[in-house]
Amino acid sequence: MADFSVFCVLLSGVSLFIYSPPPHLIFSQTITGHAYPEFVKIVEVGPRDGLQNEKEIVPTGVKIQLIDMLSGTGLSVIEATSFVSSKWVPQMADHTDVLRGIQKASNVQYPVLTPNLQGFQDAVAAGATEVAVFGSASETFSKKNINCSVDESMLRFEEVINAAKKRQIPVRGYVSCALGCPHEGHIEPSKVAEVAKRLYEMGCYEISLGDTIGIGTPGSMLKMLQRVMKDVPINALAVHCHDTYGQALPNILTALQMGVSVVDSAVAGLGGCPYAQGSSGNVSTEDVLYMLHGMGIETGVNIAKVIEAGSFICSALSRKTNSKVAQARSTACCDASL
């Protein structure tokens, strides 16, 4: 059980949450008085989660070039593709060609999503060295997203994880709808904790808690993490925020204050969810990096190169970037040329 003290004090009528961080994490102090991680690992999910909902099929070569560009930014984890049925997610039908076509950097992991044992076997045959399973804290969302109940999904994931253990392949776990569901609305933190705990105990080395529809606030993020951290160690947790309500960065900041040091994001803010209509993209990698670097938190990632990769994929998709940082820098460059 993961536990550390969290208590509330009143200072001039303002409530402040103060906590004692776990000893295995190294923190740096900031001017806010909160303790933050000195280093944050960014998990780039743009090539998979960011592109899976595109209506027009993105050429395989474009996907490969995007991943190759991201591999040169300093990112240590890039989620490459998803080994799901092309019937359910046509955009990912070229998963084998993508995984085999990218120039794999020695210092980068390229996990792929594998919803079941067949997907895992196909991924391994294509050269996957890390996989991920995608669960949900919502029964309704689970049935619409992966066509089975939460309990049934756990049986599938157990097969995948056991097979991965035999091959010494690490498995990452996702819990969607951690802060709300498009069908059920509010999701109790205890339900999120239950699913996260089951995935962790099965053998997932890291559990990413997803605000699938971007409805969370710092308050709901705080309550959810406090509950989940009773069952899963803080160093095994990550957050995955969508920016539908413009709350992604505040939510990430709250997670950092709680001790989370792994953040999922997507280049250019790509994304959405095919089973959560109306949800906007993931928080942009560029914006997360700008915030973290401005706080003195190291990531090892070159923001300029990420912006370049974002410009490439947005040009390929004929759309404007969702990254506020990229937009601002583009405007500044245009103004400077006048």
Regions from the PLM with identified roles:
Residues 2-8, 17-338:
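Catalytic cores and adjacent flexible loops of soluble metabolic enzymes
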